[in-house]
């Protein structure tokens, strides 16, 4: 009997299974970064197995933190109201939903930032994401504190929108990761120059969010091994060991780790393990593991590979084409393949809300009615 379908207490939630929907950018918000009605349908469909945790796509904490067209935000009243429709629909299915709080930093589109408010392209340092990319401006210390306040306000907005909690996006080469890793952060002030200095932004953001909404409504995501968007410091272990130790002290709802075999949305050949982080973090909270999992490897992760931890498996792309995914895993029903060509088509329901539930799931729902 696998632990994958045994309950687990996470923060303020009582999950019925240990499969979470991992965060995935889909660009189905309006041009003003307001969630469209199809987003409500999309998340409600994937909440259909009661007691499942969904983590939203990356959602910008403020207008200046954006720079991606048709990505949602959580910084104004229209966005909060639209997200409330989403969270109500998810809760009506008996499931849970966290919003992923996001500041883009140097990979943002500078033209879009200018058009949407005259905002600069910024980062920890004036270090471009690649040789042919624009060079960002380094944030001043005064600005850093203002951005930390943006995270806290976004967390409060999330609770107002009905979210069960928030996940701080500290992974995949976005702004927090740009402070964390020395491949980007070349600062010599208190926000860089050492393991402690580089970790400071992530930890100050975490503390501010915890103060705003509570540790039991806060998670954080790290990707120590990812090469996505110019990341991967030479030896990430000391940096992320320190973050693990310090994060463990905060008593968060969970920590979310990206396996080395995933770089952004791509599969890569990699064998670097997360054991070093887990040893430093201990058993401070449940841990979500994400990275190319299928039904078989998800069972192995919770029962064997991470059996000593309260492990949750984050599954992304297969959840797109299998809205009843936890039911399929539990009942040995094959996954429907996804269509990568529809992943990022702005505002389009095709490949978004048109994937069917399995016949077996539909029968189970009818029988329970």
Curated annotation (Swiss-Prot):
Keyword Oxidoreductase: yes
Cofactors: FMN
Disulfide bonds: none
Short name of any one Pfam family annotated for the protein: Oxidored_FMN
GO biological process, one term: indole alkaloid biosynthetic process
GO molecular function, one term: NADPH dehydrogenase activity
Record's keyword annotation contains Flavoprotein: yes
Catalysis: reaction(s): dihydrochanoclavine-I aldehyde + NADP(+) = chanoclavine-I aldehyde + NADPH + H(+)
EC number from the UniProt entry: 1.3.1.100
Keywords on record: Alkaloid metabolism, Flavoprotein, FMN, NADP, Oxidoreductase
PANTHER family found in the cross-reference section: NADH OXIDOREDUCTASE-RELATED, NADPH DEHYDROGENASE 2-RELATED
Similarity section: Belongs to the NADH:flavin oxidoreductase/NADH oxidase family.
Protein's recorded name: Chanoclavine-I aldehyde reductase fgaOx3
